[in-house]
Curated annotation (Swiss-Prot):
Keywords from the named record: Aminoacyl-tRNA synthetase, ATP-binding, Cytoplasm, Ligase, Nucleotide-binding, Protein biosynthesis
Residue positions of motif 'KMSKS' region: 276-280
Subcellular location: Cytoplasm
Residue numbers covered by motif 'HIGH' region: 30-38
Signal peptide: none
NCBIfam families, A to Z: lysS_arch
Organism of this sequence: Methanosarcina barkeri
InterPro entries: aa-tRNA-synth_I_codon-bd_sub2, aa-tRNA-synth_I_CS, aa_tRNA-synth_I_cd-bd_sf, Lys-tRNA-ligase, Lys-tRNA-ligase_SC_fold, Rossmann-like_a/b/a_fold
Chief subcellular location: cytoplasm
Family: Belongs to the class-I aminoacyl-tRNA synthetase family.
Protein name as it appears in the record: Lysine--tRNA ligase
Enzymatic reactions: tRNA(Lys) + L-lysine + ATP = L-lysyl-tRNA(Lys) + AMP + diphosphate
GO MF: ATP binding; lysine-tRNA ligase activity; tRNA binding
Length: 537
C-alpha cells in the first residue's frame, strides 16, 4: 500500500511522544568539499524540524561544524605540502586557497551559503569555538574521571580491546600542534588542565578549554548532553552494530546522565556509476557546484521524496532532466489543486520548497531550448521568455535559471540535448523529400497568416497535417498538386530540425518553435523548401 503520511511526519510524531523542547542537530566535518551526499543529512534534519514545527512543537535546529577534528591524511585534492599538517585540527591549519581564515572555513563557507540557498537556516556552532569557550569542560572532566567506565562500555559494545594508555581526551601538543600523537599522563580537575606527552618528544600541560578535544566516540555523546540534542540523523556507518551510535547511547546515559537522541539513519547517495560519494576519495559533486546547475527546490526534492533508509541514485546528466520534470509536474499539480495529487505527494512538495529563494515558472527543459536558441545572450533569452508567454518581471530568477542551464550544458548535458541553430539554411536541406519541402512551404505560409502562436499550438499544427481536411493538409496537397496526401508527422518534425539545425532530431518542437520570431521561421522554412546545393553555393 502506498504511503499516505510522509516519513518526516512519521518521525515527528514519534519524537513528540516525549514532551518538552526538542533540538534537531546535524554535524559534518569540513575536511573536504561538502557534497550532496552530506546534503542528505542536513535536508533530512530540516524536513523533520519543519514537521515538528508544523505540529506545534517547541523545536530548534542546529548545525555543528566539526572543525576541531584532525586532518586525517593528505587527500587527493591537496598538495603534498599538507603532510606537515596531518594530525592537526583543521581549524588550525592554512586555507588551501589562502583567502579564508583556515582550512575548515575554506570548505565550510560555500557549504553554509549553499544551505541558505536551499532555504535551510540552522543555528551554526563551530566545534573549535565550543571547546575554546569551555562548553565541553565539564564533559571533559567527567570523561577523564570516568575513563575506566567509558573504556568498559567501548569494549562491551564494540568488541574491541581498549589500550591501557587510552584516554577519552586528546590533548593538542604545544610544540607540533597535533592532537593525534599525544597521550594523557595526568589531569587537574581544579586547575582544569591536562598533562600529556607527545610523539614529537614534547611534554606539557594544556587547559581543558581548547587544549584538545574528546575522542569521537566520546565527543558525540558529550555533545548530545551539552547541547540537549533530542533528534539527529546520521549515516549508516555510524549505525552499524557496535558502531559509534551504539557506544554513544550508552555513554550519554551512563556517563553523562542524558537520554540519547532519536536516531534517523540514512543511506548513501550514489553518484552515477561511481558509487557512494566521499570527500576523502574525491567521488563528489559539491552542493555549491550542484546549485550552479540545479534549482534548490529540485535538490531538496531529490532527498525529500525518498525515505532516509533507502539509497538514492543521482546522475547529473540525462537523468537530471527526468528528476526536474518530475518535480515540475508535482509543482503544477499542487498549485492547480489537482484532485489526483495525493496527501503524500502534496507533503513531498511542501517539504521540498526552498523558502526565500528564486522559483522560476519556466520549465528547466524549456530554458535548455531557450538558452541555446538565444546562443547564451541574456537579452535574447528575456525576449524569448516573453514571447513564450512567461513574465520577465523577475529578471534575477530568470538569470539564475539561465545560469543553471548554461553550466549544465557545459558540464553534464548529453550530446542529444545540445544543438546550435544554423545561421543559414544547412546543406542537409538538400536531403529533404518532396513531401517535406511541400510541408515547410505550406507551414511557413500558415504561420505567416496567424497571430502569435504558442508552443502547444505549433505542436498541434504540425500534427494536424496528417488529418485529411485540415488547413495544413490542404495547403500541402496544393503544393504537391495531389489530393489529401498521406503524412507521417515524424517526417515533418525531421524537416523542421533539418532546416534549423542541420540534424534530424532536436528539442521538443513546440517549445523550440515558439522560441523563434515568427518572421525568422517563415523565411527559413521557405528557403529550406526551395534549397538547392547549386543555387546556395
Amino acid at each position: 500500500m502506498a504511503d499516505t503520511i510522509h516519513w518526516a511526519d512519521v518521525i515527528a510524531e514519534d519524537v513528540l511522544k516525549k514532551n518538552g523542547k526538542h533540538l534537531v542537530a546535524t554535524g559534518i566535518t569540513p575536511s573536504g568539499n561538502i557534497h550532496i551526499g552530506n546534503m542528505r543529512e542536513v535536508v533530512t534534519a530540516d524536513a523533520v524540524y519543519r514537521a515538528l514545527v508544523d505540529k506545534g512543537a517547541n523545536a530548534d535546529f542546529i548545525y555543528i561544524a566539526d572543525n576541531y577534528d584532525p586532518l586525517r591524511k593528505v587527500y587527493p585534492f591537496l598538495p603534498e605540502s599538507y603532510v606537515e599538517h596531518v594530525g592537526k585540527p583543521i581549524s588550525e591549519i592554512p586555507c588551501p586557497c589562502g583567502n579564508c581564515a583556515n582550512y575548515a572555513e575554506h570548505f565550510l563557507k560555500p557549504f553554509l551559503e549553499a544551505l541558505r540557498r536551499l532555504g535551510i537556516n540552522p543555528k551554526v556552532y563551530r566545534a573549535d569555538e565550543m571547546y575554546k569557550t569551555g562548553k565541553y569542560t565539564e564533559a571533559i572532566k567527567t570523561a577523564l574521571v570516568k575513563r575506566d567506565a567509558i573504556a568498559k562500555i567501548l569494549e562491551e559494545v564494540s568488541g574491541k580491546t581498549v589500550a591501557s594508555d587510552w584516554s577519552p581526551f586528546n590533548p593538542r601538543c604545544d610544540q607540533c600542534g597535533r592532537i593525534t600523537t599525544t597521550k594523557v599522563t595526568g589531569f587537574d580537575l581544579e586547575a582544569e588542565t591536562v598533562d600529556y606527552v607527545c610523539a614529537c618528544e614534547h611534554s606539557g600541560t594544556v587547559p581543558m578549554a581548547g587544549g584538545g578535544k574528546l575522542t569521537w566516540r566520546v565527543d558525540w555523546p558529550a555533545r548530545w548532553s551539552v547541547l540537549g540534542v533530542t533528534v539527529e540523523p546520521f549515516g549508516k556507518d555510524h549505525a552499524s552494530r557496535g558502531g559509534s551510535y551504539d557506544t554513544g547511547k550508552r555513554i550519554v546515559k551512563e556517563i553523562f546522565g542524558h537520554e540519547p537522541p532519536y536516531p534517523i539513519v540514512y543511506e548513501w547517495i550514489m553518484l552515477g556509476k561511481q558509487g557512494a560519494m566521499s570527500s576523502s576519495t574525491g567521488v563528489v559533486v559539491s552542493i555549491s557546484d550542484m546549485l550552479k546547475i540545479v534549482p534548490p527546490e529540485v535538490l531538496r526534492y531529490l532527498i525529500i521524496r525518498t525515505k532516509p533508509e533507502k539509497h538514492i541514485q543521482f546522475d547529473p546528466g540525462q537523468p537530471l532532466l527526468s528528476l526536474v520534470d518530475e518535480y515540475e509536474r508535482l509543482r503544477t499539480q499542487f498549485r492547480e489543486n489537482d484532485p489526483s495529487l495525493g496527501t503524500f505527494q502534496g507533503r513531498v512538495y511542501e517539504l521540498s520548497r526552498a523558502t526565500g529563494v528564486c522559483q522560476s515558472e519556466i520549465p528547466f527543459k524549456q530554458m535548455v531550448t531557450i538558452y541555446q536558441v538565444a546562443r547564451g545572450d541574456f537579452d535574447q533569452v528575456l525576449k524569448i521568455v516573453k514571447r513564450s508567454g512567461f513574465s520577465t518581471e523577475d529578471k534575477k530568477c530568470i538569470k539564475e535559471l539561465a545560469d543553471n542551464v548554461s553550466k549544465w550544458l557545459k558540464l553534464y548535458a548529453p550530446p542529444f540535448a545540445k544543438f546550435k541553430v544554423k545561421e543559414k539554411v544547412p546543406v542537409q536541406a538538400a536531403t529533404l523529400s518532396e513531401l517535406q519541402r511541400a510541408f515547410l512551404s505550406a507551414f511557413a505560409a500558415l504561420i505567416e497568416s496567424r497571430d502569435e502562436i504558442s508552443g502547444e499550438e505549433y505542436h498541434m499544427l504540425v500534427y494536424s497535417a496528417k488529418d485529411e481536411g485540415s488547413e495544413l493538409n490542404r495547403r500541402i496537397a496544393e503544393k504537391l498538386n495531389a489530393h489529401a496526401p498521406q503524412v507521417d508527422p515524424r517526417e515533418l518534425f525531421k524537416a523542421i530540425y533539418i532546416s534549423l539545425l542541420g540534424q534530424s532530431s532536436g528539442p521538443k518542437a513546440g517549445w523550440f518553435l515558439s522560441s523563434f520570431e515568427k518572421e525568422f521561421l517563415v523565411e527559413r522554412f521557405e528557403e529550406a523548401s526551395n534549397y538547392s546545393p547549386e543555387i546556395n553555393v
